[in-house]
Amino acid sequence: MLEDLIAQGWLDERRYTEEFVRTRVARGEGPVRIAAELQQRGIESELIASQLAQAEDGWMDRLREVWHKRFGGRVPRDHQERARQARFLRYRGFTADQVSRVLNGRADEE
């Protein structure tokens, strides 16, 4: 049955992965979280990497949007606030480097 669906093009991991990444990026999730969820669903690492690479240009923009929406773009005033913001952004699936760049005001650096 599954083989028939695959042969007819009704089941396609590439299309599923594309749509999954697109949906999760729109929800404000980062590459780490998206990759982990796809791996849990049994998607091949190479396919995950290629789909995340296609969305790569927008990660910092997406991170800034999430940060502004949640924290109003306020730079942390103390260590405790910085840790709270960083924890939230890491939970959303962004890398430590990406989070650090946003919280240090260096989000535009490549």
Task: Label each residue range with its predicted role.
Residues 1-110:
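An alpha-helical, amphipathic repeat domain used for nucleic-acid recognition
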